[in-house]
UniProtKB/Swiss-Prot annotation:
Disulfide bonds: none annotated. The chain crosses the membrane at residues 27-47. It is found in: Host nucleus membrane. GO terms for cellular component: host cell nuclear membrane; membrane. Glycans are attached at N7. Belongs to the adenoviridae E3A-1 family. Keywords: Early protein, Glycoprotein, Host membrane, Host nucleus, Membrane, Transmembrane, Transmembrane helix. Its main location: host cell. The keyword Membrane applies. It is a single-pass membrane protein. This is Early E3 9.0 kDa glycoprotein. It comes from the Viruses.
Length: 77
């Protein structure tokens, strides 16, 4: 006589709940990563000046080569 009969279909009842939470967590993580990437892109577009964009501007360079123009080095100080 069998006193306890295990039903194999009831063991899967709790596993159907897990993928829903995993899917929601995955969607949330993807949204957060997307917002971070978008904010970095917008920061570089609107807030930070990318170097060498204005090639024809008449700004003073960051450094002055002193070997090629030694007479100009004293005038720029």
């Amino acid at each position: 006589m069998i006193l306890f009969q295990s039903n194999t279909t009831t063991s899967y009842a709790y596993t159907n709940i897990q993928p829903k939470y995993a899917m929601q967590l995955e969607i949330t993580i993807l949204i957060v990563i997307g917002i971070l990437i978008l904010s970095v892109i917008l920061y570089f577009i609107f807030c930070r000046q990318i170097p060498n964009v204005h090639r024809n501007s008449k700004r003073r360079p960051i450094y002055s080569p002193m070997i090629s123009r030694p007479h100009m080095a004293l005038n720029e100080i």
